[in-house]
C-alpha cells in the first residue's frame, strides 16, 4: 500500500460524503442566476401601472428607478386613466359607533365591480377637534376635502391615507375670530366684502385645471346682506386662499343643499334669484378653473321654472355634467 495521502477530493469520493459549496461560491452562483433574469423596463411599467395605490407606495422603496417612475406625472396620468376605466368606486364615511370616539371617522372604499385587486379597504382617521359634524366635498381624482366653518380644510386621498391641512380661508377666520379688526377682506380683490360672517349654501368644490393640470379648491357662499356670492380659490400647489371676482354673478345666489360638481374643467352650481330662492328660472353658474371666470347659463328645458335645489340633482357622469329633476310624480328626469 502506498504511503501517499489521498487528496480531499479522493477521500470524499471514497467516503461518499458531499460538502456544501463555500459561501463565496454560493453567492457567485446566485448572482449568475439573477443576472440571467432580465425584464425590460417597458414590461415593468406595464405591470406596475396595473397595481393598486398601496402597492405602488411600498414599491417606491425598491429602487431609485422605480421611485422616479412611480412618482412621475406621466405614470400618474396612466395609472389614473386605467383606474377610471375599471369602474366607479364608492366612499363610505361613518362615525366610530364601537368605541364612541368623538374624533374618529371610518372611511371605506368599495368598488362597484369586484375584482381580485379591488377589495374594499377600510381605514380609521382621527380628526383633532372633530365633534360629530364635518362637511365632505365631492371627489376629484380620489381627492376629498373634510372641513367646516371653524376648522382647517383637510385634503385627503383615502387610497394612500395621505392628507394635507390647509390654511384657514377668510370666511373661516371671520367665523372663528369675529370680532377681529385685523381680519378684513381686500376691497380691491373683493368688491363685495363680507361684513357679516353669516353665510349660507357654503360648500367646497374640488376640481382640476384642464390646461395646467393643477388641483383647485373653490369655496363659494352667499352672504348676508344679499350680494353676489363671494368666492375664494386655493391652488393646491400654492396653498393660499385668494378671492375671485364675482361681479358677473350680480342678482344671482347659489341655491341651498347643493354641492358644486366638477366636469369638463369647470365647477357648476345651481342659482336662483337675489335671495337664493328658486322663484325665477333656475340657472347654472359655471366657473372655468383655468381662466377663473364665471358665466351663467340656462338649464335644460325639462327643468321646472321654480324647481327648488333639493329637487334638482347635479353629478359627474363619465366626465360630463349630468342634471336631473325629481318631478311631482316621483319620476326622475335626466
Curated annotation (Swiss-Prot):
PROSITE patterns: FBOX. Residues 1-31 are annotated as: Disordered. It comes from Arabidopsis thaliana (Mouse-ear cress). Residues 33-79 form the F-box domain. PANTHER family: BNACNNG10540D PROTEIN, F-BOX PROTEIN CPR30-LIKE. The lineage of its organism: Eukaryota, Viridiplantae, Streptophyta, Embryophyta, Tracheophyta. Residues 15-31 have a biased composition (Basic and acidic residues). Signal peptide: none annotated. This is Putative F-box protein At2g02030. It comes from the Eukaryota. Residues 1-13 have a biased composition (Polar residues).
